Curated annotation (Swiss-Prot):
Gene3D superfamilies: Winged helix-like DNA-binding domain superfamily/Winged helix DNA-binding domain (1.10.10.10). PANTHER family: UPF0502 PROTEIN YCEH (PTHR38768:SF1). Belongs to the UPF0502 family. It comes from Geotalea uraniireducens (strain Rf4) (Geobacter uraniireducens). This is UPF0502 protein Gura_0277. It holds the Pfam family DUF480. It comes from the Bacteria. InterPro entries: DUF480, WH-like_DNA-bd_sf, WH_DNA-bd_sf.
Length: 219
């Protein structure tokens, strides 16, 4: 994505999408409802505790970036909604996948299908893969596939609203097997060097003996 959101903007945008799909009768959201959604303990990773003023700052930034706006619907209490349908032409399956990625971070296809059921029913994994493919094929792409983690059978996917995701240290750490092989290789190299040094020392001793013998012939 060309625009990079901070962590709070990501959380607010994810909550607006989620609540539109799960509780449309209460959408658009008041500031209080949106703050509660941001601090919700279920379906969130990480779990946050934020004040309304932080949510307001995030909303103002999202409005400036044309990703959210103040709803024009009647009522004395201001309410807010996202603009991804108008701005990016996203459909409910795409919104559901993006909401999950925004609210929980990188996930596998299976995790997205299971967790996204509350927002949109996916008949099978292929349906989720199709949605991910469409989101990755956009210009600019909205989603990326991450390198497969050590010990995992499946790759995870991440949103790009906050730029390219940083790979966790765990993803870059060699597996125990790889680490063990590295140590074994180092040990073999050291043993070989020690053997070569011992051989050189023997040769030096032999050369000294020969030199001494040669000298003794002239004494």
């Amino acid at each position: 994505m060309e625009m990079h959101l901070n962590d709070m903007e990501v959380r607010v945008l994810g909550c607006l999408i989620e609540k539109e799909l799960t509780t449309p009768e209460y959408y658009p959201l008041t500031l209080n409802a949106l703050t509660n959604a941001c601090n919700q303990k279920s379906n969130r990773d990480p779990v946050l505790t934020r004040e309304e003023v932080e949510v307001v700052r995030a909303l103002d930034s999202l409005k400036f970036k044309q990703l959210a706006l103040l709803s024009a619907e009647g009522g004395r209490v201001p309410k807010y909604r996202h603009t991804l349908v108008e701005k990016l032409r996203l459909d409910p399956p795409e919104l559901a996948v993006l909401a999950e990625l925004l609210l929980r971070g990188p996930q596998t296809v299976g995790e997205l299908r299971t967790r996204g059921e509350r927002m949109h029913p996916f008949p099978d994994l292929a349906a989720v893969e199709e949605v991910l493919g469409e989101l990755m094929a956009r210009t600019p792409p909205l989603v990326t596939r991450l390198p497969r983690q050590q010990g995992r059978k499946e790759s995870r996917h991440a949103h790009l609203f906050a730029g390219e995701p940083e790979l966790a240290t765990a993803e870059l750490t060699p597996s125990p097997e790889a680490a063990r092989l590295k140590v074994m290789a180092e040990n073999e190299r050291i043993a070989k060097l020690e053997e070569e040094v011992a051989g050189l020392r023997s040769e030096v001793v032999e050369l000294r003996r020969l030199v001494d013998e040669f000298k003794s012939q002239f004494e």
